[in-house]
């Protein structure tokens, strides 16, 4: 048995050497983390005692003051079937913003995702599909470059420029006020990052829940300190907004390519590139909470301001293998690729944070090995405590005073780490999750350890960290209630309802009336009636339809909707039902516009389809900036003069109304303005006193020649009341008298 004792003694002394080595490394790393803790708490206390005593905290209402600038959301999508629709639906119904477009990058060899995106684009005019040039999966950066190229093409065709470019994944749940925050800052800041707070699962889902622990501390303390000391903010890859200046600089720097296609963490890479160019970066923790409710708590010890932070929510991987894959990709990108791409700088402060980024390659191994050593030491301690005559193996540690001091210091630093983790997890998720984060420490260390091994293995296999391919991990998406179907073509609905034949549809498609969409064109050609068109449009959009008399709408109800809003969305308020405003429209209203309408009128809005021309004539009567002859008044006066019977006047009105068309419809149908971009221009037009046509010419969107041509087509398409009266048998003198009487009213 002597040999066994020798082996045990050798193991014991080897354990001591390993423990000493680990203790020294952990002490250095612990001091590093403790320094960040001290800076954070000193800065927080100082700001609370000085800044916030002199100045009130900024209210979220300030975010509403700037005009909505156009923002582009970039979403790379590889094998994201069934996710994009939910994201667009949730964004449309929850975002307190209207002037945004979503560009989804897909791949030619991913038809299922493309099909999903096509269906979403049919319902949401602000969602656009981008097909990458190369088959997937390429890198996320390559996909984003394709998306950015498509955005620049869209800007040229729509004749306007986006002010900000936002990174998101398809699984992200975007905070309702996120775009307003970006809109408020994007003119002054070049990189804006908001926190990421993962969704909770059941407490037994340890893998997924380790993400809430790490992000709570990272985005609650570490990144704010980094920004304060170094002025540099690493992008999280989601919830990041780049200014136009930043994107232009990146494109110029990369000769037309903004994102490094060989990088697995292009977001991390860009933060340094922009910093090198002297651009300003900011990490924003901005709560949306009423001052009166600031002290309210949803969970025990949960902070009201922290838990109402504008942030990105998403589910993170819930299985051990997917978490290891994802984190190994992060390690390759930040540690190995980052070390090769971003050399040490002349700034000691920035170098310090580069060191903190890269020490993970060591600390992840050290933390796990330290756990294993601690388990062995605890077993030895249990042995000595349970057996009175046990050998005192731990005496080899107690004999070194400096080692015991080092171990006690490390113990104190470890307790501090646990306390810090509990504090920051509790702030957002409540005390229960804060305490459970202690139990998840070992599991998180195991995941990080295995991710380190996998990252190291991949780098060694490829020989160059920049050759490792994008290993996309899948995420869950929160369930979204509501109908996410795509829109059926209008022609198909008319065929199914046996309103027209296939031959008539083919003829209508070949001989479409210039300036009109298919429905209006078939109405002009006499193939369908206004009622049949309204019924088909209502079926297409899943709403009801009805016929209205705009002149019978109470003026008190008209006052519910500002003229700029009614003209922008081409709607009329019809009635109130249980505090819900019912509005009429001649066409389907997309979910983004419907949500914007709800915000602008201050009450829930529902819409119905009405007969062709009834909204146009109603808008001209109630809201038009420059009123011409009132056609309804001319008919009324003709009846009063007994030049027409009431029956004749009614028939003339039924001929007149369906042949009235909006200028914007003709303009977009002719292709002079992208239909998905018209909303951006209409938002800007809300603040102008000019007619829409003159406004577009003044803004350089269209030429005067184009305006004249569109107005000419509008006049040719529309039927004038004067011509109908002459056709009904009135002479020119009678029509002139009616015009004169109309002007005098």
UniProtKB/Swiss-Prot annotation:
Annotated compartments: Cell inner membrane
Write out the GO biological process terms. Answer: protein secretion by the type II secretion system
Any one Gene Ontology MF annotation carried by this entry is: cyclic-di-GMP binding
Q: Name any GO cellular component annotation.
A: plasma membrane
Q: Which residues cross the membrane?
A: 8-28, 362-382, 393-413
Q: What is its main location?
A: membrane
Please provide the record's keywords in A-Z order.
Cell inner membrane, Cell membrane, Membrane, Transmembrane, Transmembrane helix
Quick check: keyword Cell inner membrane in the entry? yes
| Name assigned to this protein | Bacteriophage adsorption protein B
């Amino acid at each position: 048995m002597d040999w066994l004792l020798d082996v045990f003694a050798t193991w014991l002394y080897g354990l001591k050497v390993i423990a000493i080595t680990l203790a020294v490394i952990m002490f250095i790393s612990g001091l590093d983390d403790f320094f960040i803790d001290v800076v954070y708490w000193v800065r927080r206390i100082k700001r609370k005692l000085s800044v916030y005593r002199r100045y009130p905290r900024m209210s979220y209402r300030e975010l509403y003051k700037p005009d909505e600038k156009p923002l582009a959301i970039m979403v790379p999508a590889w094998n994201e079937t069934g996710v994009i629709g939910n994201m667009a639906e949730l964004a449309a119904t929850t975002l307190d913003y209207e002037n945004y477009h979503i560009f989804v990058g897909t791949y030619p060899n991913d038809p299922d995702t493309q099909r999903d995106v096509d269906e979403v684009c049919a319902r949401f005019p602000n969602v656009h599909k981008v097909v990458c040039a190369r088959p997937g999966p390429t890198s996320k950066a390559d996909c984003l470059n394709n998306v950015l190229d498509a955005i620049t093409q869209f800007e040229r065709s729509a004749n306007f420029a986006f002010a900000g470019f936002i990174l998101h994944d398809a699984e992200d749940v975007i905070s309702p006020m996120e775009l307003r925050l970006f809109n408020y800052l994007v003119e002054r800041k070049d990189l804006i990052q908001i926190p990421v707070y993962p969704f909770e699962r059941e407490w037994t889902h340890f893998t997924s829940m380790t993400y809430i622990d790490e992000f709570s501390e990272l985005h609650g303390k570490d990144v704010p300190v980094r920004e304060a000391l170094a002025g540099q903010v690493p992008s999280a890859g989601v919830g990041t907004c780049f200014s136009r200046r930043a994107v232009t600089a990146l494109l110029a720097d990369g000769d037309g390519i903004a994102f490094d296609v060989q990088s697995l963490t292009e977001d991390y890479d860009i933060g340094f590139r922009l910093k090198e160019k002297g651009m300003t970066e900011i990490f924003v923790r901005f709560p949306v909470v009423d001052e009166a409710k600031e002290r309210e708590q949803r969970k025990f010890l949960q902070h009201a301001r922290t838990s109402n932070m504008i942030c990105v929510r998403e589910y993170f991987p819930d299985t051990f293998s997917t978490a290891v894959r994802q984190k190994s990709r992060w390690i390759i990108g930040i540690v190995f690729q980052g070390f090769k791409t971003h050399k040490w700088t002349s700034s000691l402060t920035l170098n310090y944070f580069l060191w903190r980024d890269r020490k993970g390659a060591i600390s992840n191994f050290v933390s796990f090995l330290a756990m294993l050593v601690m388990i062995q030491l605890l077993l030895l301690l249990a042995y000595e405590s349970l057996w009175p005559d046990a050998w005192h193996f731990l005496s080899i540690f107690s004999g070194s005073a400096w080692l015991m001091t080092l171990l006690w210091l490390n113990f104190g630093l470890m307790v501090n780490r646990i306390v810090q983790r509990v504090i920051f997890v509790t702030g957002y998720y409540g005390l229960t999750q804060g305490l459970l984060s202690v139990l998840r420490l070992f599991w998180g260390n195991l995941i990080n350890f295995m991710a380190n091994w996998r990252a190291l293995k991949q780098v060694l296999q490829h020989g160059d960290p920049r050759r490792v391919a994008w290993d996309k991990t899948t995420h869950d998406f929160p369930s979204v209630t509501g109908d996410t179907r795509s829109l059926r073509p209008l022609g198909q609905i008319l065929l199914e309802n046996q309103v027209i034949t296939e031959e008539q549809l083919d003829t209508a498609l070949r001989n479409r009336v210039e300036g009109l969409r298919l429905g209006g064109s078939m109405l002009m050609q006499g193939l369908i009636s206004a009622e049949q068109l309204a019924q088909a449009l209502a079926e297409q959009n899943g709403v009801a339809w009805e016929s209205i008399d705009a002149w019978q709408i109470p003026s008190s109800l008209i006052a519910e909707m500002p003229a700029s809003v009614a003209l922008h969305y081409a709607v009329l308020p019809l009635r109130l039902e249980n505090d819900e405003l019912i509005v009429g429209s001649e066409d389907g209203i997309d979910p983004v516009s419907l949500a914007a309408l709800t915000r602008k009128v201050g009450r829930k809005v529902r819409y119905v389809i009405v007969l062709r021309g009834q909204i146009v004539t109603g808008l001209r009567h109630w809201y038009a900036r420059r009123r011409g002859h009132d056609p309804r008044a001319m008919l009324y006066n003709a009846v009063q003069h007994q030049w027409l019977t009431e029956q004749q006047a009614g028939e003339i009105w039924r001929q007149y109304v369906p042949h009235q068309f909006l200028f914007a419809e003709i303009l977009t149908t002719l292709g002079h303005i992208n239909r998905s971009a018209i909303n951006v221009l209409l938002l800007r037009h809300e603040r102008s006193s000019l007619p829409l046509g003159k406004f577009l010419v003044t803004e350089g969107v269209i030429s005067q020649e184009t305006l004249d041509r569109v107005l000419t087509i509008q006049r040719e398409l529309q039927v004038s009341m004067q011509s109908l009266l002459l056709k009904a048998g009135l002479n020119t003198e009678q029509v002139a008298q009616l015009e004169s009487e109309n002007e005098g009213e």
